[in-house]
UniProtKB/Swiss-Prot annotation:
GO cellular component, one term: plasma membrane
Keyword Oxidoreductase part of the UniProt annotation: no
Family per record: Belongs to the UPF0161 family.
The protein, known as: Putative membrane protein insertion efficiency factor
SMART domains found in the cross-reference section: Haemolytic (SM01234)
Major place of residence: membrane
Amino acid sequence: MSLKSLVRKVFSFLLLIPIYFYRVCISPLTPPSCRFTPTCSAYAVEAIKKHGPVKGLYLAVRRILRCHPWGGSGYDPVP
């Protein structure tokens, strides 16, 4: 395994920890409110796993910023 690959995996893992914490500990306590399918947290996990930590985080933040009452809704897959 190259150093670049190892660094990418470590940073991806570090970004996924708070998302999994949210999904397990916080999300069950709040009513469903995501306007999109898949949910924003599922989208973030998939984006980070598919595109790596930098582009995945960028895609996840863009998605979260679109998730508001005046934004879009519906099916929005990870590109």
